[in-house]
Amino acid sequence: LANATISGQAYSYAAAPQRFPQWFNYTPIIYTGWSALPTGTYEFYAVGNTCFYNIDQSDGTSNGATTQLGMPITAAGNQVFSGACGLAVDNGAILTGAARWVIEKSSTWVQFQKDMGTGTFTTSGTKRVRALVIYEF
């Protein structure tokens, strides 16, 4: 997205009007728990008031137990959103149990747990998450 004046406005009630891009690249500003933002794919797609946020990153250097990534659109304030990750790596090892993502009400970031509870990631080595995060805004 560009910080520019909008010109040539048009309205469409279709979910994906002709020539309208469905996925937008995104660079998270918040990346808590890594020494630098891991390289990879961060993109989102909005339909109505639902955001689909695709995260597919490479291993990054862990520097904290709390693991969070900024979101492209602030979450709605009516509920907490949560789901399972497609892949998670902690201290260089692929986790064999399910990891999860959580978005609190009105949050601007998504938090990751290394299990389906509140388990935090190791503060050293490498870590990685892969998830399709779906939430209302």
Give names to the regions the model predicted.
Residues 1-4, 44, 99-105:
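Broad, structure-driven detector of short, well-ordered beta-strand segments within folded domains
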Residues 24-48, 56-77, 116-125:
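Surface-exposed ligand/attachment interfaces on beta-rich extracellular proteins
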Residues 64-66, 72-115:
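Extracellular attachment/recognition segments
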Residues 1-23:
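Beta-strand-rich solenoidal segments
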Residues 125-137:
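Short, structured beta-strand segments at or near domain termini in extracellular proteins/domains
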Residues 9-10, 124-126:
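Solvent-exposed, conformationally flexible loop/turn segments
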